[in-house]
Amino acid sequence: MKKYILILFALSLIVSCSQVTSTTFNGFGPRDFPITMGSQSSVDVVIAMDKLWEEGDFDGMREHISDSARFVWEDGRVHSREEFINSLKSDTLMYSWTFDWAFSVKDDNPQEINEWVNAGFNVVETTKSGDTLGRAHYNEWYLINKDGKISFWFNTKANR
């Protein structure tokens, strides 16, 4: 009996010490390659952009945006980097928001080194006098290039 207990104990020790492998991909893409998780450094670019946006440091955003970046708003407007920054500077409304999530995924093309970051925000839009104009959930996608800069951005809006 003692022998069986020792064998059982040894087996349980071996099983409990074996390394657990985790799946780093899921889903599918148009080229039949798996989708894999991206890096924290790409998420950090979006976090830095959000901080600058919240502080109103729109000129500071240039550091995180490639010269040839394109920004596509939920209403169809398309901006270059400078048009994007200028539109933020000239906006007459006030916004408050919660930054609810961000995660990064790699392109399904193994030759591609850009990463996509998805971020979610709940936004309240008000006038300067404090009158609430609307509430919405924004889902944003940022394409982070090999230099760690935003090269493409688009968002969707769900009024709530």
Predicted regions mapped to residue ranges:
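Hydrophobic pocket/interface hotspot
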Residues: 49, 60-62, 69, 84, ...
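A short gly/proline-enriched turn/hairpin at secondary-structure junctions
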Residues: 32, 64, 68-79
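Short, low-complexity N-terminal intrinsically disordered segments enriched in polar/charged residues
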Residues: 18-55, 63
